């Protein structure tokens, strides 16, 4: 039996009680699990300072000396402050405790030799350490002359006396028991080529490094291994998918494409649009099913690229569909596509929940007869009665609004799965895209059409609302429209709904000469769409809303976006909301209104928004500030967010190298059966068998 698979209960010092807590709180069930529960930080314990060397700006330091005496000071009727005067023979400091007096007197004795560890501060002209860590100098230090590891613990663990120090002792005991080298999980050729330390060295040094260099090498090796297997799993899945699912071969672009390009397209495509169309064209004639993610900021021209993709399908005798997450966005796509195709005799139909009865039957019959060439819809397209004669291309707008299972249901609409183009206006950082959409090829439209004025973003405090209202009035009198957004409403945040309702009432008093619409997530769909339509048509001048307007609403006449309490929104969400304006020829503005009291992180978010309109810069910053698990849509992917040591936001370079190595393996062994790589495939099976998230990719 592999020693790493032993039950954690049988590690000396654990037993059945602590075993239950470790299982429940950390998911640690075996020795191997504990070995892979990595420290979150380290403190250098290799140096002992003299008291006269201490400075007030030092972080954690350690000193050695003796307790000279104790003193007590009354803080209140029930509370005492205990002070131990501590000397190393050349200076004196105070060790201070604000609670636990009995424990202090019982544990620490005058005249004994101790090593004290903590953060020095100055009080009353003298250095002091509040609630320091203290060890007898005569006892062997766990981390003597090295880096001390610190582990995350929970309240339940602390109740059972499982502190970071206790975990450190458990790991030390375990490593002493593991006398054989820990088995390698990477082939020698990768370890040597990438100058990695062995797995045995990495796992021992990540818990007990002698110095910062040793710690860094250990962590780099373990991060690489983790990200390598994530990428190997994703690329194996993609390779398997390509072998199993052949795609329709579209050998020509066809007359519809040529007529549209030469007769209906009134402007030049950007260089980025041309590049992406070529990438899509190459996919469609390759004989494999296209699975491509198209990223582009708001207004970059993704819908036009999607339309040209669908026209290629039509030119080869197939049908196409485009699915949007909301009815109003589907209606906008329908109107845009009809306008683009005016005079080309291509039948385009709309299918949403609002298309009912006789009209719905007409659309469905024409679809299966092949008369409808392009279908625009919502998730209604996925319903069983919807049948195409020959579906060749499916475009999915705002992928994170559709579950993976829904995407798969599209494949059942024809004899072969259609080519899939996934579009998103939510920029995804490259490292995250490698993980979430690792099975998709990625295209990026990274330039806006010429002449588009960037939105000007301005930060205002809530005390400046009077001048803000004057600016809104001026814009509306110039013929523009305005969004005013309140924070997202959830069932647990009743006050936000009240704020929106109160805000709406107040705005009606402030702007009696203008018409105001109101939209939020608690409204019935029909009521919400009716209010939205009033704003889209220009019947109302102000739209008071929550973030239900975040995706896809296109009102070129709207030139002002006011986001109240914007400190409560993430960067990507703020950027998406800002994307609702700046769609016309006029200068547009995004006003971020906050309270005066802002955390450092919030101030940074606001500053980034005011500095740049680049969605990819914003997405990278958002990933670093919030982490991948918080980003919208990532939880649906089920991929790789159970990382134990790697950080997708900060380990992009390691991720890229890991993907390169994984791709080499897949290229050399696409069927994953070669005995040369048996070690890798065995390890990958182990990871998928023990990790729910890994299994989800497969």
Task: List each language-model region with its residue ranges.
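Short, surface-exposed secondary-structure boundary micro-motifs
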Residues: 66, 119-120, 233, 566, ...
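Inter-lobe coupling/hinge segments of SF2-like helicase ATPases
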Residues: 275-278, 289-607, 671
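Flexible hinge/switch segments at interdomain interfaces of large molecular machines
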Residues: 247-256, 446-449, 584, 632-637
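Upstream accessory/linker segments immediately N-terminal to the RecA-like ATPase cores of bacterial MutS
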Residues: 73-264
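OB-fold nucleic-acid-binding modules
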Residues: 37-68
């Amino acid at each position: 039996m592999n020693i790493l698979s032993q039950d954690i209960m049988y590690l000396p010092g654990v037993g059945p009680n602590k075993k239950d807590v470790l299982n429940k709180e950390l998911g640690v069930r075996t020795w191997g699990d504990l070995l892979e529960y990595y420290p979150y930080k380290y403190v250098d314990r290799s140096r002992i300072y003299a008291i006269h060397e201490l400075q007030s700006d030092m972080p954690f330091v350690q000193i050695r000396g003796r307790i000279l005496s104790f003193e007590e000071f009354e803080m209140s009727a029930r509370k005492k402050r205990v002070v131990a005067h501590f000397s190393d023979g050349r200076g004196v400091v105070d060790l201070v405790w604000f609670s636990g007096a009995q424990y202090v007197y019982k544990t620490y004795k005058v005249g004994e030799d101790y090593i004290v560890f903590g953060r020095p501060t100055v009080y009353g002209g003298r250095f002091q350490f509040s609630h320091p860590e203290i060890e007898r100098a005569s006892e062997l230090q766990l981390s003597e002359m090295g880096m001390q590891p610190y582990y995350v613990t929970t309240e339940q663990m602390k109740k059972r006396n499982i502190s970071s120090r206790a975990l450190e002792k458990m790991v030390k005991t375990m490593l002493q028991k593991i006398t054989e080298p820990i088995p390698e999980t990477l082939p020698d050729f990768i370890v040597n080529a990438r100058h990695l330390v062995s797995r045995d060295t990495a796992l021992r040094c990540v818990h007990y490094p002698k110095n910062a260099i040793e710690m860094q090498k250990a962590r780099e090796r373990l991060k690489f291994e983790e990200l390598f297997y994530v990428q190997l799993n994703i690329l194996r899945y993609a390779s398997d998918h390509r072998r199993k699912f052949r795609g329709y071969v579209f050998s020509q672009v066809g007359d519809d494409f040529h007529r549209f390009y030469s007769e209906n397209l009134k402007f030049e495509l950007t260089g980025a649009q041309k590049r992406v169309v070529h990438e899509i064209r190459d996919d469609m004639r390759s004989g494999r099913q296209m699975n491509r993610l198209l990223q582009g900021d708001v207004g970059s021209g993704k819908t036009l690229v999607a339309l040209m993709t669908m026209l290629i399908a039509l030119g080869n005798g197939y049908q196409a569909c485009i699915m949007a997450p909301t009815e109003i966005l589907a209606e906008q796509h329908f109107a845009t596509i009809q306008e683009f195709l005016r005079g080309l005799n291509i039948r385009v139909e709309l299918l949403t929940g609002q298309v009912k009865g006789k009209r719905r039957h007409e659309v469905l019959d024409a679809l299966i007869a092949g008369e409808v060439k392009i279908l625009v819809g919502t998730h209604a397209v996925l319903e069983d009665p919807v049948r195409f004669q020959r579906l060749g291309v499916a475009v999915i707008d705002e992928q994170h609004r559709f579950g993976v299972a829904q995407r798969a249901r599209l494949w059942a609409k024809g004899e072969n799965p259609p080519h899939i183009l996934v579009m998103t206006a939510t920029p995804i950082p490259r490292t995250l895209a490698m993980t979430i959409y690792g099975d998709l090829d990625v295209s990026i439209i990274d330039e806006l059409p010429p002449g588009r004025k960037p939105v000007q973003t301005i930060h205002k405090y809530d005390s400046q609302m009077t001048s803000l209202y004057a600016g809104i009035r001026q814009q509306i009198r110039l013929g523009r429209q305005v969004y005013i957004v309140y924070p997202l409403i959830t069932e647990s945040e009743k006050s936000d709904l009240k704020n929106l309702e109160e805000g709406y009432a107040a705005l009606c008093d402030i702007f009696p000469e203008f018409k105001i619409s109101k939209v939020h997530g608690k409204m019935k769909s029909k009521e919400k769409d009716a209010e939205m339509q009033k704003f889209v048509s220009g019947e109302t001048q102000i739209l008071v809303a929550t973030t239900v307007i975040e995706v896809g609403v296109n009102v070129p006449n709207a030139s002002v976006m006011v986001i109240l309490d914007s400190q409560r929104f993430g960067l990507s969400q703020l950027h998406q909301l800002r994307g609702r304006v700046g769609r016309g020829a006029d200068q547009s503005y995004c006003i971020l209104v906050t309270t005066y009291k802002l955390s450092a992180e919030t101030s940074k978010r606001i500053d980034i928004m005011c500095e740049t309109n680049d969605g990819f810069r914003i997405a990278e910053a958002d990933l670093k500030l919030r982490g991948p698990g918080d980003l919208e849509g990532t939880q649906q992917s089920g991929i790789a967010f159970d990382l134990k040591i790697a950080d997708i936001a900060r380990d992009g370079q390691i991720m890229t190298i890991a993907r390169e190595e994984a791709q080499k393996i897949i290229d050399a062994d696409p069927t994953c059966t070669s005995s040369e790589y048996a070690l890798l495939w065995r390890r990958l099976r182990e990871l998928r068998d023990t990790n729910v998230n890994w299994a989800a990719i497969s």
